[in-house]
Amino acid sequence: MGAFIHDFLVWLFLPMSGSHTHEVSGWVSWHGRAMVLSWGFLLPLGVLVARFFKVTPGQNWPHVLDNKRWWRAHLYGQSVALLVALVGVLLVWGRNGGTGVWAQWHGVLGWVVTGSGVAQALSGWARGSKGGPTDASLRGDHFDMTPWRKGFERFHKCLGYLAVTAACVVLALGLVVADAPRWMVLALGVWWLALGSVFALLQHQGRCIDTYQAIWGPNPRLPGNRMAPIGWGISRYDAAEFKQRFMAKNTKKEDIP
């Protein structure tokens, strides 16, 4: 048994190619760490938060509206992640990333993903005004669901999911190009599997609640509630449906200040 564990550990720490040596320059190592931290961990977590935690567990919705915890986590988390990714880009700026076909694809797709991340940040900045209930004025691009807001939501949501998905491919190519140790491949694969499982579970539970309802409630007369939600797999509830689905088993209801 001891010999098996020893052999398995040796196998784990060998490069993917099976070579007995694994030497990469410092800038390659730090580039990889920055990109895995950003695109492999922080940005996917930000997507999960924005999709499934607009109404947090225990929140007494619709009596308590516009819970900004998800918004702050998404904004600050994605901002930090993008800065880390840009540091990773600077580490390889002007350097030879390799001439093989996988290295070339890694470079091209990497620039596409980086550009998508910057575009996401710019689109968030240009999303338009919000409107009540916590703003000074009830009217706003979001409250009224103006054409500008509809365009922003379609662009931001679609590009966000595509960018994170493409980043998985780019990270996998980076591991191949760097001939990374096998444990890195397995660790990243397990992490992505865990993220996918949590995503599927929360989606099945109906936790992807419409942003408009999370902020303004289920009143069917409101502008955003008179149209279909933008995006796929988004749930809407009235007060009774929400209470039955999410609050029935709670012995204590938490009001979000």
Regions picked out by a protein language model, each given a short descriptive name:
Residues 2-257:
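Membrane-embedded alpha-helical bundles that constitute the cytochrome b-like, heme-associated redox core
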